[in-house]
């Protein structure tokens, strides 16, 4: 199967190309922290020769508790993203939660993300598609890999085939996620070769059934990421924080920022190795 290439400016994303890093912080906590985290990602990825897109949310509209921090909002968030782009020359990805947000967000960032909980909302899909922007679709925890073909088809019918898919695990009983590594290629097959990336950060979530915020398994980030990279990915999605235990959202799943470089050294080594192998058809 020929692999589809989705271009984010001068960055090409495809399952058979060197992996692209989508990373940054879960939610914009402050302008200064965003600058610090983005600068570190840019420095490390340039050193290692890894294509990079900065990620952060301007509004976490789906927090479990009404008292949880959501972010600076649309207007302030776009100002921060514009400054990051000007300062570091970086591409930016962020998520939208309402159809009305799609157009103004697409005028600032390079990739707009469809959250997992909203991935089947047709009005939102159509609004995002109409922007013409590159789209990243998070696979819902409750949707099988093969069903992702239907979501991509919605985007295509609405006039946009520049779609990346992102696996972030599947429900395994209550309040737990597992990642089916076979499902990554199922998504590739179901969508006719669209790029698939792996969100290792959110795949590490493990909830307290009575808690107001997600727990996580940060200590296992490297082993889960290694497993994903061994499959052969178009990209890896990883959030980091200088003080994960103090992060305002998903700190228990965030990579300590000072571990980013050694972490990415391992990921790049695996990606280079896996993609150096010739294709091996074991279906016959």
From Swiss-Prot:
GO terms for biological process: keto-3-deoxy-D-manno-octulosonic acid biosynthetic process. It is found in: Cytoplasm. It comes from Yersinia pestis. Belongs to the KdsA family. This is 2-dehydro-3-deoxyphosphooctonate aldolase. Pfam families: DAHP_synth_1. The keyword Transferase applies. Signal peptide: none annotated.
């Amino acid at each position: 199967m020929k692999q589809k290439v989705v271009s984010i400016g001068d960055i090409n994303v495809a399952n058979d190309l060197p992996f692209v890093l989508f990373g940054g912080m879960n939610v914009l906590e402050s302008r200064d922290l965003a600058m610090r985290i983005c600068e570190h990602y840019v420095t490390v990825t340039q050193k290692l020769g890894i294509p990079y897109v900065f990620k952060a949310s301007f509004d976490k509209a789906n927090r479990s508790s009404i008292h949880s921090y959501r972010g600076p909002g649309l207007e302030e968030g776009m100002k921060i993203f514009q400054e990051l782009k000007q300062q570091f020359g970086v591409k930016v990805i962020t998520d939208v939660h309402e159809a009305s947000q799609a157009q103004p967000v697409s005028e600032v960032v390079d990739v707009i993300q469809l959250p997992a909980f909203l991935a089947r909302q047709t009005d939102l899909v159509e609004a995002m598609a109409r922007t013409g922007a590159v789209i990243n679709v998070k696979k819902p925890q409750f949707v099988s890999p093969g069903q992702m073909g239907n979501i991509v088809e919605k985007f295509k019918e609405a006039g946009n085939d520049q779609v990346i898919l992102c696996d972030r695990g599947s429900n395994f009983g209550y309040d737990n996620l597992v990642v089916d590594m076979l499902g990554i290629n199922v998504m590739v097959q179901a969508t006719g070769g669209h790029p698939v990336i792996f969100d290792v950060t959110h795949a590490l979530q493990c909830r307290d059934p009575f808690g107001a915020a997600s727990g996580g398994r940060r200590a296992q980030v490297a082993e889960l990421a290694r497993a994903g990279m061994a499959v052969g990915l178009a990209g890896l999605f990883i959030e980091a924080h200088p003080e994960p235990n103090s992060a305002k959202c998903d700190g228990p799943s965030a990579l300590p920022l000072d571990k980013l470089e050694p972490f990415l050294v391992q990921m790049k080594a695996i990606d280079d190795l896996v993609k150096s192998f010739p294709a091996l058809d074991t279906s016959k």
